[in-house]
C-alpha cells in the first residue's frame, strides 16, 4: 500500500471530445462516470486490485463476498468544462458508518473549482443482500486517506 496519499487521492483527467455535447462543453452525465472511474483508479494506485473489490473481472475465480452498490450520488456544476481541459481531481473519502462510505470528488481547472461530485456506497453481502461491514481492503483505503488530514473535532 502506498503511504503518500497524494499519489492516489489527487488525480488528473483530460476532457475528451466524446465527453462533450454539441455546445462543446462536458455533458452532465460524464461527471458521475468520472467520479466512479477516479475512485477505481484511486484504489488501484493505492494497491488494491480490481478483482478484490469489483465482480466480473477477468481471471476472477470468485466474486467478492461483499458488494458496494452506489446508493446515492450528486453533482454540482460550477463552471463550464470544455474538450481539451486538463482537470485536477481531488478525492476525499469519508466513512459514514461501519457499512457505508462516501467519496467527495473535487474537479479543478487552473486551481478553480469547476465541479463537485459525491458518490455514496453501502456494503452488502452478495449472498444475503443485507448490509454488512465494509471489506477490510476498503477499510484500509479509508483509514489511509485520513493520514495527514486535519479534521474538525
Curated annotation (Swiss-Prot):
Its EC number is 3.1.2.28. InterPro entries: 4-hydroxybenzoyl-CoA_TE (IPR050563), DHNA_CoA_hydrolase (IPR022829), HotDog_dom_sf (IPR029069). GO terms for biological process: phylloquinone biosynthetic process. Keywords: Hydrolase. It is an enzyme of class 3 (hydrolase). One of its GO terms (molecular function) is fatty acyl-CoA hydrolase activity. It catalyses: 1,4-dihydroxy-2-naphthoyl-CoA + H2O = 1,4-dihydroxy-2-naphthoate + CoA + H(+). It comes from the Bacteria. Disulfide bonds: none annotated. The keyword Heme does not apply. Pathway: Cofactor biosynthesis; phylloquinone biosynthesis; Quinol/quinone metabolism; 1,4-dihydroxy-2-naphthoate biosynthesis; 1,4-dihydroxy-2-naphthoate from chorismate: step 7/7. The active site is at residue 21. Catalyzes the hydrolysis of 1,4-dihydroxy-2-naphthoyl-CoA (DHNA-CoA) to 1,4-dihydroxy-2-naphthoate (DHNA), a reaction involved in phylloquinone (vitamin K1) biosynthesis. Belongs to the 4-hydroxybenzoyl-CoA thioesterase family. DHNA-CoA hydrolase subfamily. PANTHER family: 4-HYDROXYBENZOYL-COA THIOESTERASE FAMILY MEMBER, ACYL-COA THIOESTER HYDROLASE YBGC. This is 1,4-dihydroxy-2-naphthoyl-CoA hydrolase. It comes from Synechococcus sp. (strain WH7803).
Amino acid at each position: 500500500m502506498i503511504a503518500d496519499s497524494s499519489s492516489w487521492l489527487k488525480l488528473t483527467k483530460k476532457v475528451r471530445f466524446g465527453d462533450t455535447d454539441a455546445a462543446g462543453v462536458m455533458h452532465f452525465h460524464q461527471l458521475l462516470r468520472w467520479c466512479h472511474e477516479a475512485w477505481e483508479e484511486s484504489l488501484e494506485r493505492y494497491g488494491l486490485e480490481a478483482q478484490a473489490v469489483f465482480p466480473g473481472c477477468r481471471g476472477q475465480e470468485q466474486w467478492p463476498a461483499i458488494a458496494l452498490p452506489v446508493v446515492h450520488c450528486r453533482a454540482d456544476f460550477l463552471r463550464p468544462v470544455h474538450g481539451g481541459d486538463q482537470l485536477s481531481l481531488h478525492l476525499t473519502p469519508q466513512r459514514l458508518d461501519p457499512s457505508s462510505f462516501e467519496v467527495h470528488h473535487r474537479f479543478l481547472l487552473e486551481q478553480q473549482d469547476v465541479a463537485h461530485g459525491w458518490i455514496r456506497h453501502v456494503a452488502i453481502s452478495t449472498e444475503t443482500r443485507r448490509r454488512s461491514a465494509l471489506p477490510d481492503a476498503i477499510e484500509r483505503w479509508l483509514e489511509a486517506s485520513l493520514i495527514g488530514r486535519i479534521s474538525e473535532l
